[in-house]
């Protein structure tokens, strides 16, 4: 899923609707299959340092045209409420998914886990 399912971003209505559908499906499937011990949990990353953020111009390596080096990145960092420096990487999301599949995630189902550094508190 994505944090876009729960928070409005301009020009992303179709994307947000698709992610909202994943959220609703996660809840419904968890209710349907809980008696069989099957768990469903949506993982909703915020801005993650990846090819998608690189293409959007918000990563440190790919700043927007006409701005001084690191300008877009610095603006984005000011919008984050401060867990760490910069965006999480794909390995952070992978760690959460691994936890969900382990005994540590045994009581997590029918919900969404946001990985957004506190952006959407």
What does each model-identified segment do?
Residues 61-92:
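Catalytic Tyr-x(3-8)-Lys segment
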Residues 18, 26:
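Active-site helix of classical SDR
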Residues 2:
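Residue(s) in the substrate-gating loop at a strand-loop-helix junction
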Residues 45-55, 59, 64:
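Short, flexible catalytic-loop segment of classical short-chain dehydrogenase/reductase
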Residues 86-115, 120:
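C-terminal substrate-recognition "lid" of short-chain dehydrogenase/reductases
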Residues 8-12, 34-35:
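Active-site "substrate specificity/gating" loop of NAD(P)-dependent dehydrogenases
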